[in-house]
Amino acid sequence: MDFVNNDTRQIAKNLLGVKVIYQDTTQTYTGYIVETEAYLGLNDRAAHGYGGKITPKVTSLYKRGGTIYAHVMHTHLLINFVTKSEGIPEGVLIRAIEPEDGLSAMFRNRGKKGYEVTNGPGKWTKAFNIPRAIDGARLNDCRLSIDTKNRKYPKDIIASPRIGIPNKGDWTHKSLRYTVKGNPFVSRMRKSDCMFPEDTWK
């Protein structure tokens, strides 16, 4: 997947259905991306790179597309895939995963079962046992990788405003969150809108 030359919003949509693999020392975790959010850098008031701000914590966001930007929010580790050329702080937050391999280990790591195991940006990273130290690593050159060949394709994609970013003017309301319609592993999915996971893919 080209993380440098494509529009960040398009990358966020294209990532839906892509297989994520994390190879721990004793366990392999896999799953399919069902929810993403695009963050558009310098002008995006909700983005960590808004206004070109650079601090030690956000250094990875300014690296070349395909870098992993991992940051902690409210004790939860959040994983972003950096997009664009070096120096342009755009990226895609991976918000939720439909799990595949390593499910028993995910249940142990999370202390939860069912859809709650990976239906949020801090939930799936804990389920996959991903450490903060992965920040700054290159996707597919470290323990975390994506598989764009053995992937799934959503039947429908919904665009909506991003989660948890009030008071950011127009950026609060822009439809930069992308979800696989009806997939029960999407965060904050109403039960009435849920479908069987297999029915949400082509």
Swiss-Prot record:
What processes in GO biological process is this protein linked to? base-excision repair
Disulfides per UniProt: none
Output the Pfam families linked to this UniProt entry: Pur_DNA_glyco (PF02245)
Q: Name one GO molecular function term.
A: DNA binding
The keyword DNA repair belongs to this UniProt entry's keyword annotation: yes
Would you identify the family this protein belongs to, as annotated? Belongs to the DNA glycosylase MPG family.
Task: Report the protein name in the record.
Answer: Putative 3-methyladenine DNA glycosylase
Origin organism of this chain? Staphylococcus aureus (strain MRSA252)
Taxonomic placement = Bacteria, Bacillati, Bacillota, Bacilli, Bacillales
